[in-house]
Amino acid sequence: MTNIRKTHPLIKIINHSFIDLPAPSNISAWWNFGSLLGICLIIQILTGLFLAMHYTSDTMTAFSSVTHICRDVNYGWLIRYMHANGASMFFICLFLHVGRGLYYGSYTYFETWNIGVILLFAVMATAFMGYVLPWGQMSFWGATVITNLLSAIPYIGTTLVEWIWGGFSVDKATLTRFFAFHFILPFIITALVMVHLLFLHETGSNNPSGLISDSDKIPFHPYYTIKDILGILLLILVLMILVLFSPDLLGDPDNYTPANPLNTPPHIKPEWYFLFAYAILRSIPNKLGGVLALVLSILILMLFPILHMSKQRSMMFRPLSQCMFWILVADLFTLTWIGGQPVEYPFIIIGQLASILYFMIILLILPTISLFENKLLKW
C-alpha cells in the first residue's frame, strides 16, 4: 500500500510543501524567518479573533471595551498584549526576512519577491488600522494624520479622504470600517502567503552562496522542521518575555488617554515599525512629495531585481556590497530614531540626510559598486 501522505490529494500538498520538499543543505538561520512569520500570522489571527469577541467598534465604547478586555475578561490582558507585541515581533521578523532577501539576492525570484512586497504593504495597512481600534489619543490622531496624506493627491484628494473617513473627520464610520478591514485583511494575507509559497516552490529556496543547489538537496523533514521548531521556541520566548515583563515598552503612553478631537498630542508618532517611513515622509517639506517618498521607500524594493548589476547573486563573496548593505541598515536605524524625535534642529537635517542616503544607496551606490566588483573579478 502506498503511503497516504503521497497519494491523498490534500495531504499530498502538505507533503510537497513541508515534508518531502527538497531544500538546500546549507541554508542558515536567516532562512528561519519565513516560518516565524507564518507563526506570527497564526498568533495574530488567533489572538485577534478572541479580542474581536469582546471589542466594540463604536467611538463611545471602543476605549472602554479594550479596558474591559484587560480588566474583566479571563486572561484578556494576556490576549491583548500578545496581539499588540505580536505585531512588533511580526515586523521584526519581516524586516529581517526582507534584509535576508536583499543580502543573498533572493529578489531574483521576482514573482516570489513582488508578492512579498505586496504582503509587506498588506501587513503595514493591517497594522495601521489595528492601531486605530483602541481609540486612544494616538489612535485618533495617527488615523487623522495618515489618512489626511491622501488629500495630497491632485484633484481627487479631498474627496477621497472624506470617502475613506465616511464624513468630514475621523469618526464612528471610520472606526467601524477600519475594524472591518482589520478583520478581513489577515485572511487575504494568508491567501497571499500561499501564493508566495507556491511561487517559491516553483524554483526552490535560495541559499547563502547564491549558487544553484540542485546537486545537493536534503528533505525538509526532519532537518528543517527541527530547525524551525527551535526558531519558533525562541520567538515565543522573546514574545512572552516582552508580554509578561514589559508589555507597554513599545507602545505610546498617549494611547492610554481616550481619543479627544479637541486636544492634539504634542508629538504625533506611529508605532516604532513605521518610524523609518515616517521620518522619510517628514523630511520633505512638500506634502505630495512627502507622500510619494513615503510610498516609494517601500515600493523601491520592487526595483531590486532590475537594479541587480552583479555577476554574482549573493553578497557572500562581495565585501564592498556588504559594506554598503550594512551602511543601509545603519541608515534605517538612524531614520527610525529620527522618526521618533520632534521636528526641530538638528533632527530635521539628520532626517533629510538619512533619507537622501537611503535612496542613493539603493538607486545609485549599490548598482555602481556591483559593476565595479564585476571588473574586480577580471583581475
UniProtKB/Swiss-Prot annotation:
It is found in: Mitochondrion inner membrane. Keywords: Electron transport, Heme, Iron, Membrane, Metal-binding, Mitochondrion, Mitochondrion inner membrane, Respiratory chain, Transmembrane, Transmembrane helix, Transport, Ubiquinone. Its cofactor is heme b. A ubiquinone binds at H201. InterPro entries: Cyt_b/b6_C, Cyt_b/b6_C_sf, Cyt_b/b6_N, Cytb/b6-like_sf, Cytochrome_b, Cytochrome_b_C_euk/bac, Cytochrome_b_N_euk/bac, Di-haem_cyt_TM. The keyword Mitochondrion applies. Heme b b566 binds at H97, H196. GO terms for biological process: mitochondrial electron transport, ubiquinol to cytochrome c. The chain crosses the membrane at residues 33-53, 77-98, 113-133, 178-198, 226-246, 288-308, 320-340, 347-367. Pfam families: Cytochrom_B_C, Cytochrome_B. SUPFAM superfamilies: a domain/subunit of cytochrome bc1 complex (Ubiquinol-cytochrome c reductase) (SSF81648), Transmembrane di-heme cytochromes (SSF81342). GO terms for molecular function: metal ion binding; ubiquinol-cytochrome-c reductase activity. Heme b b562 binds at H83, H182. Binds 2 heme b groups non-covalently. It is a multi-pass membrane protein. GO terms for cellular component: mitochondrial inner membrane; respiratory chain complex III. Component of the ubiquinol-cytochrome c reductase complex (complex III or cytochrome b-c1 complex) that is part of the mitochondrial respiratory chain. The b-c1 complex mediates electron transfer from ubiquinol to cytochrome c. Contributes to the generation of a proton gradient across the mitochondrial membrane that is then used for ATP synthesis. Heme 1 (or BL or b562) is low-potential and absorbs at about 562 nm, and heme 2 (or BH or b566) is high-potential and absorbs at about 566 nm. The cytochrome bc1 complex contains 11 subunits: 3 respiratory subunits (MT-CYB, CYC1 and UQCRFS1), 2 core proteins (UQCRC1 and UQCRC2) and 6 low-molecular weight proteins (UQCRH/QCR6, UQCRB/QCR7, UQCRQ/QCR8, UQCR10/QCR9, UQCR11/QCR10 and a cleavage product of UQCRFS1). This cytochrome bc1 complex then forms a dimer. Belongs to the cytochrome b family. This is Cytochrome b. It comes from Neotamias cinereicollis (Gray-collared chipmunk). The gene is MT-CYB.
